[in-house]
Amino acid sequence: MTREEKSIAIGDLTEKLAGTNILYVADISGLNAETTSNLRRACFKAGIKLEVVKNTLLVKAMEASDKDFGDLPLTLKGNTSIFFADVANGPAKIIKDFRKKSDKPLLKGAFINDEIYIGDNLLDSLVNLKSRDEVIGEIIGLLQSPAKRVIAALLNNAESKGEVAE
């Protein structure tokens, strides 16, 4: 790769990093072609972009980015693949699903909404993260619950008064 190609690749990666709040870094080395293809297919179906990158280029892109990736660049050793997603737990679910059949991919770390998660031991925690839509749904449910009770009590009270008047 020439210097010009490297600078273009760093620029592209920097743009992608700026455009996402959810980034997973994993090691998919050792997966055969069929399994890698299945992983890519599963990512595509889930709306996740999977790319294999050079560590040095990714480190430079992280340094050039406005975001603080903390110690995440320190995890970039060996083969590295990055998952770009819109749902916080999407890549974790795919990684966990693939780990049922194989010991790979290994999670190196994740950057989720300015929070850094480092280590494969956090995979279960990341799987259990709620998506934005799930959190909004829970909040709406919590807000609606007291209002429904008040309305039900008022209707119940009105019905009981109506029966007495008759």
From Swiss-Prot:
Recorded GO MF terms: large ribosomal subunit rRNA binding
Alphabetical UniProt keywords: Ribonucleoprotein, Ribosomal protein, RNA-binding, rRNA-binding
Any GO BP: translation
Classification via InterPro entries: Ribosomal_uL10, Ribosomal_uL10-like_sf, Ribosomal_uL10_bac, Ribosomal_uL10_bac_type
Gene Ontology, cellular component aspect: ribonucleoprotein complex; ribosome
Signal peptide segment: none
Gene3D superfamilies xref list: 3.30.70.1730
Assembly behavior: Part of the ribosomal stalk of the 50S ribosomal subunit. The N-terminus interacts with L11 and the large rRNA to form the base of the stalk. The C-terminus forms an elongated spine to which L12 dimers bind in a sequential fashion forming a multimeric L10(L12)X complex.
Function comment: Forms part of the ribosomal stalk, playing a central role in the interaction of the ribosome with GTP-bound translation factors.
PANTHER family: 39S RIBOSOMAL PROTEIN L10, MITOCHONDRIAL
Family of the protein in this entry: Belongs to the universal ribosomal protein uL10 family.
Protein name per its UniProtKB record: Large ribosomal subunit protein uL10
Designated gene of the protein: rplJ
